[in-house]
Amino acid sequence: MITDFTKEHPDKTLWRFWIPMMFSVMFQQIYNIADSMIAGKFAGEDALAAVGASYPITIIFMAFAVGMNLGASVVVSRLFGAGDRKGVKRAVTTAFASSLGLAAVLTVFGYFFSSNMMEWIHTPQNIMADGILYLKIYVFGMIFLMLYNVCTGVFTALGDSKTPLYFLLGSSAGNIILDLIFVAQFHWGVAGVAWATFIAQGISAVLALVTLFSRLRSFAGEEKQPFFDRGYFIQIFAIAVPSILQQSVLSVGNLFVQDIVNRYGSAVVAGYSGAIKLNTFAINIFMTLGSCLSSYTAQNIGAGKAERIPLGFRTGLKLSAVAAVPFVVLYVGFSRQMMGLFLNAESGAAITAGMEFLRIVAPWYLMIVVKLMTDGIIRGAGAMTYFVAATVPDLIIRILFALMFSRNYGSTGIWMAWPFGWIAATVLTLVFYRKVRRQSGDLA
């Protein structure tokens, strides 16, 4: 189903579009969380810590895939909004060709420098080998990660958020089943977790690719279209590169934070690993609504209806606030039960560390959703410089405050840095949003 954001009230279209996207991300995150849960429950605290220690590094690789997703989504949204179906197909094939080349480079780099990266963040020695093993297997799946994210970006640009959900339902179930077989039955430990993810991503990517190209056959008619278009390549990367830089900056910040966490031993690392997965689950739910706003904004700009964008922004704020409240209640009121999903009762120190993180960070979700909705509008409008610039203070403040607070409050002080970074980033993003509105005129 293709959604046109340029006609109906956003209260209707954004809600209908967001729900399948939200479930897609939920299932994607569920099998990420399942990796950690099964590792912690069946392979032990050190296995959970090893997967968790490598997680900030995998997020850097993910940043490239998400950047290509965004680049393809915004460019295709504009072409689709303008009614240029031939352009849509050329932009899609260009995005795939570019992403395959990028995936090859990242795979080679990740494999040969995995041990160096784990050493740079001072990974505890008792989990170092497992962390490196997990990372090496993970990078073999870069081609699938890239392909799936570009497919998802194109489906989103065309207003179809249901198709990616169907693929994720199957691959999520498959990933969990494979986790249980490889880790609980075969006792492959961390390697079993990594291979389960690799296989699940591969199935999802191939199915998404086949479905997308079968759907695009009608877009260009019988006339043969060029597979690669230099102009669309430049447009895609003009959006993708700032997004990659923005997310990489965040990921580097997370690496610095992980470095600080690692100094407190594998128990704190394990607790942080579980808590950060829960935090990421919530944040990604909110981010999907921001992605909806990007498509909404890009389509309306392409159709010459930019005056509809502030209306969509207000709808996004309302929906995101409603989504944030249950997570705040769950993570603050039931933090022990949440950490119990990952760790057995004997891992008391790890559970306590994770509970502290959730109780300190989760109440601020009601603020970060404002930034994420504003980010969605700014990305869709193509103002990527502002989008990137609002991220830097979050990074700097989070690292500085983590260093300062940890000296007096130990690992608890690290978690206290999150709200300060979010406050600065939210204020800056709102300032940039107002500038975008003034510069464009129609966004007033």
Segments (PLM) and residue ranges:
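Transmembrane helical elements of multi-pass membrane transporters/channels
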Residues: 16-35, 137, 148, 171, ...
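Small-residue hotspots at the loop-to-helix junctions and early N-terminal turns
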Residues: 43-56, 131, 135, 194, ...
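Helix-terminus/linker motif at the lipid-water interface of multi-pass membrane proteins
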Residues: 30-48, 118-125, 181-188, 248-277, ...
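Hydrophobic transmembrane alpha-helices of multi-pass small-molecule transporters
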Residues: 60-63, 107, 175-180, 204-209, ...
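N-terminal transmembrane alpha-helices
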Residues: 5-42, 56-71, 75, 100-107, ...
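Short alpha-helical transmembrane segments in multi-pass integral membrane proteins
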Residues: 1-18, 76-141, 185-241, 297-363, ...
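Small-residue-rich hydrophobic transmembrane alpha-helices
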Residues: 48-108, 145-164, 271-335, 368-382, ...
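Short runs within selected transmembrane alpha-helices of multi-pass transporters and secretion channels
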Residues: 69, 138-156, 164-172, 193-208, ...
